[in-house]
């Protein structure tokens, strides 16, 4: 453990966790053992003295874009997807609080009975008080992904880096699950991610990150302790930057 926060390169970070990461090997919903492991990883980073914010996806419950493909109005489908992210945020909060991690859920869609509405200054104040802020509801707008929400919230919170937790250990030139010869990038530019149409994040999210010089690090959430390792420039990952 690093006792001196000044020894760390990244002191304020945003972690993007996909909905799929929360369901483990299930086809739908939550795998609580997996969520607890993620919460333990987050606690390890907090114990280093790092301020942590989180954006959760909702794909383990509902995917708006898939519903739109079968005829549902896209805006309506996206709003349902935003509600799914609130379910995930509250689930993650509950597991984290069982480990004595102070958290607050802030939703871009106001739901006063279950969580706080997203207010930038309030979110920053929570982080200053060493609370983990979990952002739910995406951006609050349809036609925007939770990756875009993660980039926006990271910039608004003045985070040093965005860490995207995925099912693979970085960015590849093709799907490593389908192509055993897929090439892994250790560093790659925003421009190359967009030009090569790499599916690590949607183009809008990458473009906003590039414009605001927000570095993105992609790593695997599957291996216990990876979050803390990646924060300290250890382990396997890909960095996306200028």
From Swiss-Prot:
Catalytic reaction annotation: UMP + ATP = UDP + ADP
Keyword Transmembrane helix among UniProt keywords: no
InterPro entries: AceGlu_kinase-like_sf, Asp/Glu/Uridylate_kinase, Uridylate_kinase, Uridylate_kinase_bac
UniProt KW Kinase keyword: yes
Assembly with partners or alone: Homohexamer.
Known function: Catalyzes the reversible phosphorylation of UMP to UDP.
Name under which the protein is recorded: Uridylate kinase
Organism of origin: Rickettsia conorii (strain ATCC VR-613 / Malish 7)
Gene expressing this chain: pyrH
């Amino acid at each position: 453990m690093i006792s001196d926060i000044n020894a760390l390169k990244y002191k304020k970070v945003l972690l993007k966790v996909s909905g799929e990461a929360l369901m483990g090997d299930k086809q739908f919903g939550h795998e609580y053992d997996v969520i607890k492991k993620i919460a333990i990883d987050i606690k390890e980073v907090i114990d280093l003295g790092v301020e942590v914010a989180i954006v959760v996806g909702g794909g383990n419950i509902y995917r708006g874009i898939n519903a739109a493909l079968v005829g549902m109005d896209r805006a309506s489908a996206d709003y349902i997807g935003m509600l799914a992210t609130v379910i995930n945020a509250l689930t993650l909060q509950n597991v984290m609080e069982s480990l004595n991690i102070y958290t607050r859920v802030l939703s871009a869609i106001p739901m006063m009975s279950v969580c706080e509405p997203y207010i930038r200054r309030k979110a920053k104040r929570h982080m200053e008080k060493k609370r983990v802020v979990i952002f739910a509801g995406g951006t609050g707008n349809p036609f925007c992904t939770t990756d875009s929400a993660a980039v926006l919230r990271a910039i608004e919170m003045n985070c040093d880096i965005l860490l995207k937790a995925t099912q693979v250990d970085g960015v590849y030139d093709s799907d490593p699950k389908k192509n055993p010869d897929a090439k892994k990038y250790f560093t790659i530019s925003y421009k190359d991610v967009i030009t090569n149409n790499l599916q690590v994040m949607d183009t809008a999210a990458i473009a906003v990150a590039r414009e605001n010089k927000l570095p993105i690090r992609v790593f695997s959430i599957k291996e216990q302790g990876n979050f803390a390792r990646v924060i300290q420039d250890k382990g396997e990952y890909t960095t996306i930057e200028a």
